[in-house]
């Protein structure tokens, strides 16, 4: 990914973390590990082992329950105070391990601690792999609204290892498919065709390989847009398709109803419906968008507790 502020690589593979040389990315001897406490112990140990192989002179960590409530200034402050107490320097590297909430939080902390230190993401959810970990947007929630506080902070690298997807529930996988659908709808008819024919059972032989291919295509679409418009002055706004409604839905539900990917699914249907009413698309195109979202077990209607007037 080549942007005005920095260039970095996205690495893909299946169960490659354990043998990946961290020094290929950073020579930092001070590494701070931020991870989701809900991750399986085996996975956490695997990543800690990967970090320790680089023989850092200083290593510490911060674990938290990755939910929208904890994606906050308060959690950021706790991490920053720990970094200060342990005297982590400007040459430090933060390694994030978890879903989009974790990458957003870690990226935000990295952007403000000592006016900016390196961060590397190891995203573990499909949504984080195809969207949240790529592009440099970081943020935390205010008391009432999502992602109101943030900064742009491009990572030093992103390691996308599909082995972590195997422990995801169908609901969390579906949340990630919503972002792949979004990328297909805004940019790539061939990806739309692949989604139409895709078998979602990743435990079926060969399907994880096909999913890896979808992830590569999807991240490339996002990376290409980010390269053109890092700070969202023009074409990067296309990546917000479905998100204007989605963030409102999540806020109205106080982050206790639909997860982000599900809200994006509903948001894309809402945006498509608005496009239909404005004459920008026809009814056949609207039906195709809605049916594709349904295929991936995503909701297509506003939840009962979401009044349109509040959204």
Range-by-range predicted roles:
Residues 32, 60-62, 95, 120-122, ...:
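Hydrophobic/aromatic beta-strand patches that form the interior of the parallel beta-sheet core
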Residues 80-97, 104-121:
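Non-catalytic interfacial helical region
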Residues 66-67, 97-99, 241-242:
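Glycine-rich beta-strand-to-loop/alpha-helix junction loops that act as flexible
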Residues 197-308:
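Active-site segments that bind and position negatively charged phosphate/pyrophosphate groups
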Residues 1-93:
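ATP/NTP phosphate-donor binding region
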């Amino acid at each position: 990914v080549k942007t005005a502020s920095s260039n970095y690589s996205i690495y893909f593979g299946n169960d490659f973390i354990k043998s990946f040389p961290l020094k290929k990315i950073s020579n930092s001897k001070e590494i701070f590990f931020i991870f989701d406490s809900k991750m399986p112990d085996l996975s956490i140990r695997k990543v800690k082992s990967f970090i320790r192989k680089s023989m850092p002179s200083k290593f510490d960590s911060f674990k938290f329950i990755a939910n929208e409530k904890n994606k906050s200034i308060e959690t950021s402050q706790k991490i920053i105070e720990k970094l200060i107490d342990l005297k982590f320097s400007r040459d430090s590297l933060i390694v994030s391990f978890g879903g989009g909430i974790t990458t957003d939080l870690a990226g935000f902390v990295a952007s403000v601690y000592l006016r900016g230190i390196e961060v590397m993401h190891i995203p573990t959810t499909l949504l984080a792999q195809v969207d949240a970990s790529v592009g440099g947007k970081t943020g935390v929630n205010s008391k009432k609204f999502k992602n109101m506080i943030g900064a742009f902070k491009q990572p030093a690298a992103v390691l996308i290892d599909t082995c972590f997807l195997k422990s995801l529930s169908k609901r969390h996988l579906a949340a990630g498919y919503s972002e792949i659908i979004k990328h297909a709808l805004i940019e790539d008819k061939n990806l739309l065709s692949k989604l139409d024919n895709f078998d979602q059972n990743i435990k079926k032989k060969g399907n994880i390989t096909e999913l890896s291919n979808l992830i590569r295509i999807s991240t490339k679409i996002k990376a290409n847009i980010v390269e053109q418009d890092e700070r969202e002055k023009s074409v990067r706004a296309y990546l917000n398709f479905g998100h204007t409604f989605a963030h409102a839905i999540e806020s109205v539900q106080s982050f206790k109803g639909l997860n982000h990917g599900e809200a994006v699914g509903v948001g894309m249907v809402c945006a498509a419906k608005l496009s239909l009413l404005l004459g920008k698309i026809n009814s056949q195109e609207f039906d195709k968008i809605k049916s594709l979202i349904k295929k991936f077990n995503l909701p297509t209607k506003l939840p009962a507790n979401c009044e349109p007037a509040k959204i």
